[in-house]
Amino acid sequence: MPSQSLTIRLPKFEETFSVFPDNGLNPHYANSRAESRAWINQYHHAVCGPNMRTFMDKCNFELAGALFYPYANEAGLRATMDLVNLLWLYDELTDTKTETEAVNAAHIVACALREPDFDDGTWICSMIKDFNQRHISKAGPNTAYRFIYNFCNYVEAVGTEAGLRAKNEILDITTYISFRRETSALRLTFDLVQYCLGIDLPQYVHDDPVFASGYNAAMDLVCWTNDLFSYNREQAKGHAGANVVTVIMKSKGVDIQSAVDFVGGYCEALTSQLVEARRILLSRSHRVYSKDAVRILEAFGDFVRGNDQWSFASERYFGQKNKVVKESRIVEIITPFSDLIAINE
């Protein structure tokens, strides 16, 4: 029998995110892309088969960096591209691992970041130490500390996610939102916002409720839209339990389109939350809030808008139908997903 299929209609995020200025593509894209691709090729050849490497080319993660960070200088942009490539490779690898294997990988990452003399001979260790030395060692002390702390939390959360996946456990909405913020690695990419802008916010700014409100809104916007765009591939791999669409369907007892519509409405509210946080901080007298923190929130707007643009410019989520889906907003949900590729293929 042919596979059953259904369709969903995606929200028009372009309209929602039009409140954020479109600052276009970073002018250093071409040069930094070639350098970053050469760098990640040293590592993904160790674990990726030829088909997965071709898929990676079509995803064009370097384009993501150029859209997320349009203001970065060439060195900063290179760092963002390297990080996005690194995170993709780590995510694809751990998607196929058991909880024990994912926890072991997390241990390697943590040791590579925190112990200068650690070297277990693995490609993961080599990649992390190389990235840290090239980029994070040059960041401000607050940013560098947060980056290492956030990276260790991220890989630990990925290990926990592998355990939830094995048990087919679906979290409630509140728990999922907090958990997704950690498994998304967005704290790392947001740390690079400060690195690229040459701003090293003190921790008390991060702890400020208004800044935290804007920060969390930006994180959730990217998390929820990515979940929505990746749902088709994840359900095909049997990983849909760790996706906000599935979480909403279960928690609210609704069908898939109602869950998608809920995501769209919630993203409108999150957009307003980010804009409001910027407005409040702009009115403060202290420069660290009215200038530096505001600039960071504005850059988060670049990230949110750039993420939506890249999702349809790349074949990451919708394959060769990306441009058709962008126009029609219609996604056909099919199991099994015909062009799904294993990392070692």
UniProtKB/Swiss-Prot annotation:
Coiled coil: none annotated. SUPFAM superfamilies: Terpenoid synthases. The keyword Chaperone does not apply. Its EC number is 4.2.3.-, 4.2.3.88. It catalyses: (2E,6E)-farnesyl diphosphate = viridiflorene + diphosphate. Keywords: Lyase, Magnesium, Metal-binding. Mg(2+) 1 binds at D91. Mg(2+) 2 binds at D91. InterPro entries: Isoprenoid_synthase_dom_sf, Terpene_cyclase-like_2. Its cofactor is Mg(2+). It comes from the Eukaryota. (2E,6E)-farnesyl diphosphate binds at R316, Y317. A motif (DDXXD motif) lies at residues 91-95. Mg(2+) 3 binds at N226, S230, E234. GO terms for biological process: isoprenoid biosynthetic process. GO terms for molecular function: metal ion binding; terpene synthase activity. Belongs to the terpene synthase family. The DDXXD motif is important for the catalytic activity, presumably through binding to Mg(2+). Terpene cyclase that catalyzes the cyclization of farnesyl diphosphate (FPP) to various sesquiterpenes, including beta-elemene, viridiflorene and gamma-cadinene. Gamma-cadinene is the major product of PILCRDRAFT_825684. PANTHER family: BETA-PINACENE SYNTHASE-RELATED (PTHR35201:SF4), TERPENE SYNTHASE (PTHR35201). This is Sesquiterpene synthase PILCRDRAFT_825684.
